[in-house]
Amino acid sequence: MASPSGQYIFGEFSDDEFKQFFVTARCTVELPPYNEHFFPCGPQSSGDFQDDMHLKFSEVIHGISGEDCPRIEFGIEEVIDHSTALPNNTDYSISSNLNPQAPEFILTCSSSPKTSNNVLHENNFDAINCQFSECAIPDGSGNADSDGTSGTGQRERKKKKKRPPGYYSYLEGVGDVPSETLVNGHANSTGLNSISTDDPDLAEDIPISTTSPRTCNSPDNFVDLNNEALSNDASMHNALDNARTAGQPEECSVTSSEQSCIPSDNGRESPVRTAVVQPFAGTDTTENLGVTNGQTLESSEEGTASNGVVLLPEVSSLSEEAKPEETSTAQAVVHLPGSASANPPAKSWASLFHNSKPSSTTQVAYVETKNATPVTSPQVTEKQVEIKEGPVPVSEDPVAIKIAELLEEVKLVHKPVSLQPRGLINKGNWCYINATLQALVACPPMYHLMKSIPVYTKAQRPCTSTPMIDSFVRLMNEFTNMPILPKAKQASGEKVIRDIRPGAPFEPAYIYRLLTVFKSSLSEKGRQEDAEEYLGFILNGLHEEMLSLKKLLLPQNDKIHINNGPDPVSEKEEINKDEQEGSDEEWEQVGPRHKSSVTRQADFVQTPITDIFGGHMRSVVYQQSSKESATLQPFFTLQLDIQSEKIRTVQDALESLVARESVQGYTTKTKQEVEICRRVTLEELPPVLVLHLKRFVFEKTGGCQKLIKNIEYPVDLEISKDLLSPGVKSKIFKGQRTYRLFAVVYHHGNSATGGHYTTDVFQIGLNGWLRIDDQTVKVINQYQVVKQTVERTAYLLYYRRVDLL
């Protein structure tokens, strides 16, 4: 850096430089008209400086116009008094038609570490007109002088005089380390470039640039790319003498020019006094360490900035290691007041020459960018948690092992629970879901199972491997217990109605979202769906999630095949398989009268869901002169065919289920047609038996049609021994095959592709029945449950074993 006795910005132009800047048609300088106002310049002790500057300036002007010009001296050490100065008057301004985008436009980008004292004393600069707008000077009374001596600062504040705006705009960009000189509006890519910082960690983290040493010494000030000039007297002098490439071609995009040459409103400070381009609202300026010295501009792009701005990428670790004093400085930078202060700044002319030599120990680097696009802080990006759609694997869920251990030791509770009824809001065609949910809530073992699983918040469990379990745990916790009424009140229906106070209805949107999470065919909103299909979706989904949790508790060499039953095959394919040689899943079983049969069982692992709803059926194939072939298949619902005219009751449908049927057209390996028969029996009865009355059938002429016929169903259902497999008839007692109705899901309407679903549930606290139609809840009598109409027909029947009541 040059000393005070050195040469200044307007001295010693070379011939090429003089012609380039002051002779070409685009580089004329318009002087203001002569005025009687006289501005004393600088400290009184610096008379030589004033004379030299005036002489050199006069020589320059004389070379341009060929005429002698009046002596106009400018001072830079006094705060401009907005009440007396005329910053916007053209009589006191110097304008130029220098094109900022032309090769002749040279800027020196200098920077140095700044304290809050120096940061607060900047002016708003219009890079297009080369003028300063009115600056907002904060209160600097509490700041020390830049040279460290309070006496000197006090004396210099008294000597400051007015200056026309814009003349010393090139003195605003400063720094104490070698920095990039922007020639032709951009940085050279072959020399070292610097933007200094007080934090030594920054120098270690930022890569070193290899650009050419087009740098200059600069006084102690900072660079505001929106509002400040980018040079000073010594830095411009060095740039002109040592690093001038005025003839170098340059392209400056309109976008870049708009960003770097935005004039500030007169009399008002820029909202954010940083190098961050103001339109980028998404940029976090307070967390960027570069904001503390007003030097950096965030960017994620590479290359040369189209507006010639040297960009420093934000280092995420830098913000975390920022010093407290730097943080406070950043706050001072951002929250500048909008009004000017009457107190003079603590800045002096002599301070421009202090600490001006480059630092040999500080490592600096820069990143050039062509497109100054808005970017977010890398620090925020690193902290963002990756959000995955759908469930995560159980291995990535830290809570999964806890739930697995809980489910492994859980014991089902069948004790009835009295819950305060709540309706479910239906904003779409979700009635088939709402009806199914009300039936499951009324199922005591299902309710107790879900209540035994703890509820985890998003903070405790940001990702889950069991979204379906989580949703039903949340659903059951929506309902609270209701005290059981005395028997005296139960005798009067009027009193019961007055005592039943349903809770506020709610929308189980988290249940609806499960259809999307699992990409089910049921996920299309507004589509009329089937309640039995949805029940199967729920029970199978819960079962599979529990199987995944169960794997965590088994050795790695033990594998569980998630399979609720064998793949569906036709009757002929199944019979052909029976003739093949036996496998590990087959065994020979001796039945009554010493008849033997080969039995196959599908892979099946028990879970709490199968312990509640799971049963087994035995399908036996009889063939003359061959052993019986049997297959055990699990089920969650019993599918009852009611199409036959003979079927009028549920008992009729159950007997039809186990009736022996003949299979026509079956041939053996020798292609001989033989007569075979098939029969299905109940091998194992579940605690909760769900009967599906198959009302929707396909006809060859009319497609899918609804069977509108009344099927009688009792409140207490006894499973006949004739329905049981021969091997279990003597093992299942009457109490284990007697069931009581606790929920009925109805389908309303005559169409198979439309209609509505409602549910009747038994309320133990009421000792009666409730009819729930979405968010409507009302009390009904038992005879209304079993009585069907043409418009409302039973579709799903939920029974509980009486020995578990």
Curated annotation (Swiss-Prot):
Coiled coil: none annotated. Its EC number is 3.4.19.12. The active site is at 431 (nucleophile), 756 (proton acceptor). It comes from Xenopus tropicalis. Residues 422-802 form the USP domain. It is found in: Cytoplasm; Nucleus. GO terms for cellular component: cytoplasm; early endosome; nucleus. Residues 139-170, 561-593 are annotated as: Disordered. Residues 569-580 have a biased composition (Basic and acidic residues). The gene is usp10. GO terms for biological process: autophagy; cellular response to interleukin-1; DNA damage response; DNA damage response, signal transduction by p53 class mediator; DNA repair; negative regulation of canonical NF-kappaB signal transduction; negative regulation of stress granule assembly; protein deubiquitination. Belongs to the peptidase C19 family. USP10 subfamily. This is Ubiquitin carboxyl-terminal hydrolase 10. It catalyses: Thiol-dependent hydrolysis of ester, thioester, amide, peptide and isopeptide bonds formed by the C-terminal Gly of ubiquitin (a 76-residue protein attached to proteins as an intracellular targeting signal). Pfam families: UCH. Hydrolase that can remove conjugated ubiquitin from target proteins such as p53/tp53, rps2/us5, rps3/us3, rps10/eS10, becn1, snx3 and cftr. Acts as an essential regulator of p53/tp53 stability: in unstressed cells, specifically deubiquitinates p53/tp53 in the cytoplasm, leading to counteracts MDM2 action and stabilize p53/tp53. Following DNA damage, translocates to the nucleus and deubiquitinates p53/tp53, leading to regulate the p53/TP53-dependent DNA damage response. Component of a regulatory loop that controls autophagy and p53/tp53 levels. Keywords: Autophagy, Cytoplasm, DNA damage, DNA repair, Hydrolase, Nucleus, Protease, Thiol protease, Ubl conjugation pathway. Residues 143-153 have a biased composition (Polar residues). It is an enzyme of class 3 (hydrolase). One of its GO terms (molecular function) is cysteine-type deubiquitinase activity.
